[in-house]
Amino acid sequence: MIQSHDLFGLELSHSFGFELGQSDTHSTHDMTHNSGDSLLQALHQSQNSLGQEYLMNDSGQVAPVVGHSSSSSHTTSTITQTHAAPAPTVVGTAGGFQIKLIWDSSVTGAPKGFMQAVIDAAQYYTSQFSNKEIININVGYGEIAGGQMSAGALGESESYGYLTNYATVTNELAKDGFTFAATNEPTQSQFFVTSAEAKTLGLVNASATALDGYVGFGTLSGTGYSWNLTANTTGQNSGTSPQQFDLQSVALHEISEVLGRIGMEGASVNNNATYTPLDLFNFKSPGTLALSPSSGYFSTDNGATNLGMFNDSASNGGDIADWASYQSPTQAGTQGLPAGFNVADAFAAFGYPGYNGDISTSDLEEMAALGYTLKVPVA
């Protein structure tokens, strides 16, 4: 479930999430494992065309749950708090793309600026996408989904979703102009689609109030590091010192996973090889999909153009769908990052203390490939 190669014990724990990595001098090395083959089976609580619903769980276990919570007044924390949970925050304009942040009671123990950093991360996405839907995300501090986070964890995410098939996924993405012509398309395999992405693709009710997922953020207590709580809505942060990690970057990363930025690359679910929509854009070479947890590259033109190298999770651990950054912050070669020594991609598999995690144009193209309509297309 979790791996850490950092001398200070810092790591990220999540179903699909952001990971801490090594410094410029390779003096620290934080890693976590993507338990992408873990699905927690759940009963579906609202009408949809996909049937039974599942929950991606960070523990790697598969078990049924008795229900799926509504997004209203949802507080799950088992951590003792002296205050009630803050009221939910709805980010975005009614009738457009919205994210409803349902604050867990644990957030009352977060430092000043924590909530605003998460809000600004959500606002970045609502400013970029024009899809008409509302995504409901529970936010915790030092916990996720009512459970303790691993010691030293930066962030975790868990996502509700559905098992469907290749034809359903590709038929919907084809409406956005994408074609699927690789020689090894997994046409007979099953696919996992997060609840949020299913809304985007028109497969479920876009205004459903049930939770789409959870994100949790570590306290960094006892690690010697702290959070940079500076935030803005541009997707390009600043001010992260050498002993800090960029909270807004982690929030951008974790929220994007709930939105569907995850990979499975054939992981077994119910004894069947399972993929995600993003796996259909992970290429080994022109015309050939990777279909493997080993490193491939992101491409939207059947592998002709490399828009960024994916993490080799088979060799390095970490998430399959994150950008390669085990060797350096810019290893993936993603496009459109602002210039600067201390700038890294927010979707990178391994983060670095002292680096601001920003959104690249490759990140935006990745989200567009999942069905999110950009208000301003990438040039």
How would you describe each model-predicted region?
Residues 2-252, 257-379:
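Extracellular zinc-dependent metalloprotease catalytic-domain scaffold
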